[in-house]
């Protein structure tokens, strides 16, 4: 049944993308499993246990949000672990927040983009829906001056017809009072991040 819903959603997102509209999601009811896949920002580095954004999102939605954040993880390395998580949890929706460590390691932009594309396609092949959380293109210089989202996330969202949660993480990092350090939110920052993700998901039809 989920595969049939996925096919309908895929057709709808392709049509909406062709029309220049934000790709839409099918509703994810309370109690469903959602996988938050990412790095230390998903894990919750910079805040106390239980103050991460996946936990805050679970409280707002009634979903069972699995925190699959691994500090230091990259889009490249994430390819080797996502399938096992999909098999184990069988999520209805996967929220992918990853790429910052790839940028810090100065990996080529196109390589990061293709690794993210691989993650998206792996998710969608299982019948789950996917969304991307845009990440700033971090570097030692940008840690000082701040920067908006890396453009490759919007490009990839358009190419793969998936919603992109933009101007959330980068906006939090631009406000010192919401940061634990230069690249991690604090507890309030994670609450704001969960609220921003919630608003985007609601607009896209997941709620």
Which residues does each PLM region occupy?
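Serine-esterase "nucleophile elbow" of acetyl-processing enzymes
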Residues: 20-75, 79-90
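Bacterial N-terminal signal peptides that target proteins for export
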Residues: 1-8
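Membrane-interface segments of envelope glycosyltransferases acting on lipid-linked substrates or membrane lipids
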Residues: 3, 31-35, 188
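Alpha-helical cap/lid subdomain in secreted, periplasmic
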Residues: 21-22, 59-60, 80-207
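C-terminal motif of bacterial Sec signal peptides marking the signal peptidase cleavage site
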Residues: 15-18
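A general structural-boundary detector
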Residues: 6, 44, 65, 69, ...
């Amino acid at each position: 049944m989920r595969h049939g819903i996925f096919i309908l959603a895929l057709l709808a997102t392709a049509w909406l993308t062709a029309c220049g509209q934000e790709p839409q999601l099918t509703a994810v009811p309370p109690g469903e499993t959602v996988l938050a896949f990412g790095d230390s920002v998903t894990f919750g580095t910079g805040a106390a246990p239980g103050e991460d954004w996946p936990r805050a999102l679970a409280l707002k939605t009634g979903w069972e949000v699995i925190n699959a954040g691994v500090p230091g993880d990259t889009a490249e390395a994430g390819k080797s672990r996502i399938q096992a998580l999909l098999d184990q949890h069988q999520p209805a929706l996967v929220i992918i927040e990853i790429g910052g460590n790839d940028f810090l390691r100065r990996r080529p932009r196109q390589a990061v983009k293709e690794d993210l594309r691989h993650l998206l396609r792996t998710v969608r092949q299982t019948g789950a829906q996917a969304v991307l959380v845009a990440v700033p293109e971090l570097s030692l210089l940008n840690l000082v001056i701040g920067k908006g989202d890396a453009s490759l996330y919007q490009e990839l969202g358009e190419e793969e017809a998936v919603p992109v949660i933009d101007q959330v993480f980068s906006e939090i990092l631009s406000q010192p009072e919401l940061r634990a350090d230069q690249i991690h939110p604090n507890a309030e920052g994670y609450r704001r991040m969960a609220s921003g993700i919630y608003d985007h998901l609601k607009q896209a039809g997941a709620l």
